């Protein structure tokens, strides 16, 4: 699923699984929401968080590999924004990330 993905890319996906778990009524999350949670995850695993634009590039890379789906919206005065949704089962993605990434295991107390 995410073999060869750098820790920053896995941390972004983990942030999205955290958002999904904490907001079961939502399916789509804006880049800014994901980036905010990602910054916390990155610091928790003691890695320097990537900036917003680099995080956006990494999210789009996950779209091209089929892990994420994205959609663009225009909101008039609020401008354009992109939202992302995990493809497949969120818990399976979360478990796969945790099992394959020792740094993320520390967040789970493993």
Swiss-Prot record:
Keywords on record: ATP-binding, DNA replication, Nucleotide-binding, Plasmid
Phenotype upon gene inactivation: Not essential for normal growth.
A molecular function (GO) term: ATP binding
Binding site for ATP: 8-12
Alphabetical list of InterPro entries matching this protein: Cdc6_C, WH-like_DNA-bd_sf, WH_DNA-bd_sf
SUPFAM superfamilies: Winged helix' DNA-binding domain
Keyword match Glycoprotein: no
S-S bridge residues: none
CDD domains the UniProt entry points to: Cdc6_C (cd08768)
Keyword Cell membrane: no
GO biological process, one term: DNA replication
Highest taxon in the source lineage: Archaea
Function: Involved in regulation of DNA replication.
Family membership noted in the UniProt record: Belongs to the CDC6/cdc18 family.
Official protein name in the record: ORC1-type DNA replication protein 3
Native source organism of the sequence: Halobacterium salinarum (strain ATCC 700922 / JCM 11081 / NRC-1)
Lineage: Archaea, Methanobacteriati, Methanobacteriota, Stenosarchaea group, Halobacteria
């Amino acid at each position: 699923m995410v073999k060869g993905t750098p820790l920053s890319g896995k941390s972004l996906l983990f942030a999205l699984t955290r958002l999904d778990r904490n907001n079961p009524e939502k399916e789509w999350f804006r880049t800014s929401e994901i980036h905010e949670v990602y910054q916390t995850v990155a610091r928790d695993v003691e890695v320097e968080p990537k900036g917003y634009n680099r995080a956006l590039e990494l999210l789009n890379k996950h779209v091209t590999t089929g892990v994420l789906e994205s959609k663009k919206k225009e909101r008039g005065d609020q401008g354009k924004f992109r939202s992302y949704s995990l493809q497949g089962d969120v818990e399976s993605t979360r478990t796969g990330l945790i099992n394959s990434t020792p740094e993320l295991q520390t967040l789970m107390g493993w």
